[in-house]
């Protein structure tokens, strides 16, 4: 076998379409139909053009604001969910994972004040709402914030 004897496998190369070369096959109108704007050279409309009707991208309201790529999304745990722990327990993201309150450690944990807590717990999380902090401390518990930035590094 030599380089000059190499050839592509049969059927792997297709002949290109040659339009407008005689009346057989794709001759005459060359697949463009008869007359009209799209039959002319350079006659294609711009993307989004709807024939003069107000296009959909102008009919719909614009999306406003911006998307912050550096935002921190939290896994939310409500304080009523913490009632599954015994009084005096130290509640950390690890114990929450073991109890099934959170699924994984991908996002930091934030404690919110939905519901009521009726026991004193030592709760450690990355973030607390003010109302959640107040309710935990009112029930005789303690609140400790974990530094998420230090955990990442």
From Swiss-Prot:
PROSITE patterns: RIBOSOMAL_L15. Part of the 50S ribosomal subunit. Belongs to the universal ribosomal protein uL15 family. GO terms for cellular component: cytosolic large ribosomal subunit. PANTHER family: 50S RIBOSOMAL PROTEIN L15, LARGE RIBOSOMAL SUBUNIT PROTEIN UL15M. One of its GO terms (molecular function) is structural constituent of ribosome. GO terms for biological process: translation. InterPro entries: Ribosomal_uL15 (IPR030878), Ribosomal_uL15/eL18 (IPR021131), Ribosomal_uL15/eL18_sf (IPR036227), Ribosomal_uL15_bac-type (IPR005749), Ribosomal_uL15_CS (IPR001196). Keywords: Ribonucleoprotein, Ribosomal protein, RNA-binding, rRNA-binding. Residues 1-48 are annotated as: Disordered. Binds to the 23S rRNA. It comes from the Bacteria. This is Large ribosomal subunit protein uL15. Pfam families: Ribosomal_L27A.
């Amino acid at each position: 076998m030599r380089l000059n004897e190499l050839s592509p496998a049969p059927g792997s190369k297709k002949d290109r379409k040659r339009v407008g070369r005689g009346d057989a096959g794709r001759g005459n109108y060359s697949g463009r139909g008869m007359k009209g704007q799209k039959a002319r050279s350079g006659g294609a409309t711009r993307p989004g053009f709807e024939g003069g009707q107000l296009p959909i991208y102008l009919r719909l309201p614009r999306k406003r604001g911006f998307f912050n790529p550096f935002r921190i999304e939290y896994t939310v745990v409500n304080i009523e969910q913490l009632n599954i722990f015994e009084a005096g327990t130290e509640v950390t993201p690890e114990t929450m994972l073991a109890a099934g309150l959170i699924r994984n450690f991908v996002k930091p944990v934030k404690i919110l004040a939905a519901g009521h807590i009726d026991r004193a717990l030592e709760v450690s999380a990355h973030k607390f709402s003010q109302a959640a902090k107040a309710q935990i401390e009112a029930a005789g518990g303690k609140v400790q914030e974990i530094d998420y930035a230090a955990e990442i590094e």
